[in-house]
């Protein structure tokens, strides 16, 4: 997965720049989301990994399925990805594009994992702190993981912090083992 994100990033960044210059961020976002949904389908995934199916075959199918719902610039992106045999990273391109769009809109997505359900007051404080840190409107998804024992883990894009008791115990165990 990390490898596909790395492959996808330059395509997504180039697509984002074109979409931004053309004033078509929403249009690109919708088209990439639709393409991502198509390539994520089980049948399509099986088709794409079939050794007898070429990148050009996949490209033709994607263009045929989307028909007139693709603008010429998105078709160009698909052509370049097909030429480089990178259509398998299409979902990740859509994902990175959305991250870039959110940053442009001063929105950031965060995942907060805690050992127990956060209270309303804790959520307010955490939201305010993250909004200030990232100078953006942070959309937080909360998850529970009792294995953390206590504390929280926060992930925002490439930035992460692990303040869980489990992490501290693992570090202590590693230090003792040395």
From Swiss-Prot:
| A Pfam family hit | OSCP
Name the InterPro entries for this protein.
ATP_synth_OSCP/delta_N_sf, ATPase_OSCP/dsu
Q: Where in the cell is it found?
A: Cell inner membrane
Location, primary (coarse class): membrane
Alphabetical GO CC annotations of the entry are:
plasma membrane; proton-transporting ATP synthase complex
**What keywords does the record list, in alphabetical order?**
ATP synthesis, Cell inner membrane, Cell membrane, CF(1), Hydrogen ion transport, Ion transport, Membrane, Transport
**Assembly and partners?**
F-type ATPases have 2 components, F(1) - the catalytic core - and F(0) - the membrane proton channel. F(1) has five subunits: alpha(3), beta(3), gamma(1), delta(1), epsilon(1). F(0) has three main subunits: a(1), b(2) and c(10-14). The alpha and beta chains form an alternating ring which encloses part of the gamma chain. F(1) is attached to F(0) by a central stalk formed by the gamma and epsilon chains, while a peripheral stalk is formed by the delta and b chains.
Looking up HAMAP family in the UniProt record yields:
ATP_synth_delta_bact
Q: Outline what the protein does.
A: F(1)F(0) ATP synthase produces ATP from ADP in the presence of a proton or sodium gradient. F-type ATPases consist of two structural domains, F(1) containing the extramembraneous catalytic core and F(0) containing the membrane proton channel, linked together by a central stalk and a peripheral stalk. During catalysis, ATP synthesis in the catalytic domain of F(1) is coupled via a rotary mechanism of the central stalk subunits to proton translocation. This protein is part of the stalk that links CF(0) to CF(1). It either transmits conformational changes from CF(0) to CF(1) or is implicated in proton conduction.
Protein name from the UniProt record:
ATP synthase subunit delta
Species the sequence originates in: Hydrogenovibrio crunogenus (strain DSM 25203 / XCL-2) (Thiomicrospira crunogena)
- Recite the lineage of the species: Bacteria, Pseudomonadati, Pseudomonadota, Gammaproteobacteria, Thiotrichales
């Amino acid at each position: 997965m990390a490898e596909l994100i790395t492959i996808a990033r330059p395509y997504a960044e180039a697509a984002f720049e074109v979409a931004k210059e053309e004033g078509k961020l929403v249009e690109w976002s919708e088209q990439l989301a639709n393409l991502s949904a198509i390539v994520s389908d089980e049948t399509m995934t099986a088709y794409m990994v079939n050794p007898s199916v070429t990148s050009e075959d996949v490209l033709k199918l994607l263009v045929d399925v989307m028909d007139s719902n693709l603008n010429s610039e998105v078709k160009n992106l698909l052509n370049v990805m097909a030429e480089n045999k990178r259509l398998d990273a299409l979902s990740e391109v859509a994902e990175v594009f959305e991250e870039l769009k959110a940053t442009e809109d001063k929105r950031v997505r965060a995942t907060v994992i805690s050992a127990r359900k956060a209270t309303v007051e804790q959520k307010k404080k955490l939201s305010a702190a993250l909004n200030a840190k990232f100078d953006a409107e942070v959309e937080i998804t909360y998850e529970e993981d009792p294995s953390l024992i206590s504390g929280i883990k926060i992930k925002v894009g490439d930035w992460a912090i692990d303040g869980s008791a489990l992490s501290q115990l693992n570090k202590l165990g590693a230090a003792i083992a040395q």
